Structures are given as C-alpha cells and as structure tokens.
Amino acid sequence: MNARDYFDWVRDASRDAESIRQQLMALESRAKALGGGGFEPRTRSTPDPRRMEGRIVAYMQREGELKTRQEADYAIIGRACRLLYGEDEDGRGGVSAGCGTLHADVLWWRYLDDSPWKQVASVLGSSVTTCRAAHDAALRWIDESGTLFDAAEMYASYIKSR
C-alpha cells in the first residue's frame, strides 16, 4: 500500500466516523422520543410495552454496531495522526519532523478533515500550488521512508470487520 492509497483509506474512515456520529445522534433522538433514552422520568405511557421493547432492543443493537465501526475508524485516524505528527502527536515526529509541519498539516486538512484544496490553502495561509507541492512531497517521503509497513495488515483487518 502506498501513501496515497493509505490516505484515501484514512479519508474514507474519517467520512465514515462523521457519518456514524450523525447517525448516533439521530438514533439517540429517536430513542428519547420512544421513551427509551436518557434517565428522565417518563411523562407518557407507551401503548404496547412489547412493541416498545423490540424497538429499544433494535436501537441498542444498531448503536452497538455503529460504535464498533466508529472505534475502528478512530483507530485508523489515530494511526494517521501519529504518522503525521509522531507517537505523541506533538509534531516532533512523523511527517512533521521528516518534511515539515506544513507537509503534515496539508495531509491532515486534506484527508482527515476532508477539505478541498482552496480551504486547505486558506487555513494554512498558503497557496493551493504550495499546498499541492507539500502534499506530493509528503506522500513521496512516506513512501520512501517505509513508514507504512503495517498499513496493509491494518487495512485487511478493517475490511474483514465490515
């Protein structure tokens, strides 16, 4: 797996994590509307407790499935952050130390935040051309440094979990 493929995968995980976050919020709202969420006292009775129980069980199963996927996505995102900024994510390692902070930040905004080039450039106070050059140089550095040696295994495990 090369760096570009890896970061495309990271972008997919980032998008999925955001989608799951929104789905969990919607599920929570529905559960509260059904009377199954939160610890607030119920102010209305449910017409058929057996029907409600089935809905609550289905909600809990779906929530569990989504949270498992979200945890896998967060593991991928965390691994990418350590690759970009070092094990402590303090900028003293990874791409940040090997190429420069701009290079790491470009990859973060482009893939983990899923930002378009104009937004990446604006946030970083650089031109799109400079950001694209930093992007390409960072991907090249990652490929040449061999820092993705375990990414293929992680990807295979991720695919199996879907």
Which residues make up each language-model segment?
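Short alpha-helical "recognition helix" segments of helix-turn-helix
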Residues: 119-124
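Helix-turn-helix DNA-binding motif, specifically the short coil turn and the N-cap/start of the second
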Residues: 127
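N-terminal interaction/assembly modules
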Residues: 1-96, 144-162
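DNA major-groove recognition helices of helix-turn-helix
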Residues: 131-145, 149
